[in-house]
Regions:
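Conserved amphipathic alpha-helical "coupling/scaffold" segments
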Residues: 1-176, 180-185
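Intracellular alpha-helical coupling/juxtamembrane segments of multi-pass membrane proteins
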Residues: 253, 257-268, 274-275
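Amphipathic alpha-helix face/heptad-repeat signature
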Residues: 111-115, 242, 260, 264-267
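Conserved NTPase motor "head" modules and their coupling/switch loops across ABC/AAA+ ATPases, GTPases
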Residues: 1-11, 20, 267-295
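Short, solvent-exposed segments of well-ordered alpha helices
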Residues: 103-106, 110, 233, 255-258
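Charged/polar positions within long, soluble alpha-helices
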Residues: 124-131, 191-198, 226, 273-276, ...
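Extended, charged coiled-coil "arm/hinge" scaffolds of SMC/Rad50-like chromosome-maintenance ATPases
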Residues: 222-251, 258
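Structured, charged N-terminal subsegments at the starts of enzyme catalytic cores
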Residues: 172-228
């Protein structure tokens, strides 16, 4: 849905193979010192920067692309830091959701709707951030910003929010209108199925018979009373199949959003690390500590 391509201009992160014997190389180059300066005590940035630095870049196009991105990040660190914060908080919400274990499909769908609403909020935060004055100055981010705006339009956000609201009402006990077959030979046209226990009409008192007639003909003309156990079971299975299908739709949505925010956190995190390293080197230079290292 939304592609992140901030490390490779034509690929997602992770396409390149790692160097051979990465642990030995990291030790020989003393990368841990550089990585700590990049991470600023953020373990995720430490891990992501280590992962990126140990994957070689050989083609000239990617090298120029990375140079532009790093230059942007060093010049406008606050812009990249805010993007990283948005992605990190969104991933924290996703981890809260995935840590919950329940077999109840209604609960799963309800929680999926809640998470979608939260992620929609973070997508809007990101869109507003990409409209800021800082975004205008970050030239290397232009392609990403343009593509994101093309995919995440205001209409898309409104449609998704409206769909979430409609499904939330349904999960809280709203009515689902069906046009389908309930059982062999029984067709429903725009009807709501009510799972009611079978009753013997002849044993009802006059008041109950009147109440039943009002229910069927006045109060709920769309209702079909399932007075046979086989029909009830068919309706239950149909409802369960509908929930399973709905669950799969939301699972796919959530997977795409999770992949987007995960890649955004990893890739923007690398440039935040570069900005942190640039600050550290600048501070060392101001303190005249780098002059001692000059030949």
């Amino acid at each position: 849905m939304f592609e992140v391509a901030l490390l490779y201009p034509d690929k997602q992160q992770g396409a390149a193979k790692r160097y051979g014997m990465p642990q030995d190389m990291s030790k020989d180059l003393n990368l841990s010192v550089i990585l700590r300066a990049m991470a600023k005590e953020d373990e995720e940035i430490f891990t992501n920067c280590q992962r990126v630095l140990l994957c070689p870049v050989t083609d000239e196009k990617t090298l120029h692309f990375r140079q532009q991105m790093v230059s942007d990040a060093v010049s406008h660190p606050e812009f990249y830091e805010e993007m990283y914060r948005i992605a990190k908080e969104a991933m924290q919400e996703i981890h809260k959701y995935t840590s919950k274990k329940t077999s109840n499909k209604v609960v799963q769908i309800t929680e999926s709707l809640d998470l979608l609403r939260i992620l929609l909020k973070y997508l809007r935060y990101l869109k507003e951030h990409l409209r800021s004055e800082q975004a205008e100055k970050a030239d290397a981010m232009y392609l990403f910003t343009t593509k994101f705006r093309e995919h995440f339009t205001d209409d898309f956000a409104k449609d998704l929010e409206r769909h979430i609201d409609d499904m939330a009402v349904l999960m809280q006990g709203g009515r689902l209108i069906l046009t389908a077959g309930v059982a062999g030979g029984l067709k429903c046209g725009d009807a709501m199925v009510n799972r009611l226990d079978p009753v013997d009409y002849r044993k009802m008192g006059k008041f109950r018979r009147t109440l039943r007639w009002l229910l069927l003909h006045l109060a709920s003309p769309e209702a079909i009373l399932l007075n046979q156990e086989a029909l009830k079971q068919d309706a239950i299975r149909m409802e369960e199949n509908g929930l399973l299908y709905t669950q799969e739709i939301y699972r796919e949505f959530l997977y795409q959003f999770q992949e987007f925010f995960s890649q955004l956190q990893i890739q923007v995190g690398f440039y935040v690390g570069c900005a942190n390293l640039g600050r550290s080197l600048h501070n060392l230079k101001n303190e005249n500590m780098l002059s001692a290292c000059e030949p």
